[in-house]
Amino acid sequence: MAKLQLDMDLECDFKLYGIGTHIGGHRLAWELNRLFSWELVYDRELESFCIKTGELISKHIVYSYRKIEEEIDVSLVLNRVPEGCLTVGQGPNSLDYLLKVNLGNIELDGVIQTIRTSKLVTLVTFLDAEKSGVLEAMFELE
């Protein structure tokens, strides 16, 4: 008997940015709120599990802002914790925070430039969600 295999491609409807900074999450959330007029607040802890054993590896703090009627969904996630990182690869692992941004129909062109105006941020870059290894974790935030 023939077996069928379901092959689904997950499509990102969001942009993912990596941020390097020396400040804590609550302070960075406040700064992003100031820059973009968002209202990021503490949401929950995102748990990261080992793929092979299913054991809990690390917990990552999440700050979120959602406006359903305008299709705005923003999440700031602590990437680096003592137990490990959500991202994979030497470059993304040096990033302190991940910023997942879906602004519906609003253009995202100026996000990096706006964040770079902050004196509290040392680095901001665009990340490929699939290559950085966090695609599944970002979908858990929805």
Report each predicted region and the residues it spans:
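Short, flexible, solvent-exposed loop/turn segments with mixed acidic/basic and small polar residues
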Residues: A2-L10, E83-N93
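Short cationic amphipathic helices and targeting signals
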Residues: K15-T21, L95-G104
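Short, well-structured beta-strand/strand-turn elements
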Residues: S37-S48
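Glycine-rich, aromatic-bearing surface loops/beta-hairpins
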Residues: Y97-E142
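Terminal, regulation- and interaction-focused segments at domain boundaries
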Residues: L6-G25
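Surface-exposed, low-hydrophobicity interaction/linker segments
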Residues: E47-G84
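Residues that cap or initiate secondary-structure elements
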Residues: I23-G25, E69, N105-E107
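Amphipathic alpha-helical segments
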Residues: I23-E39
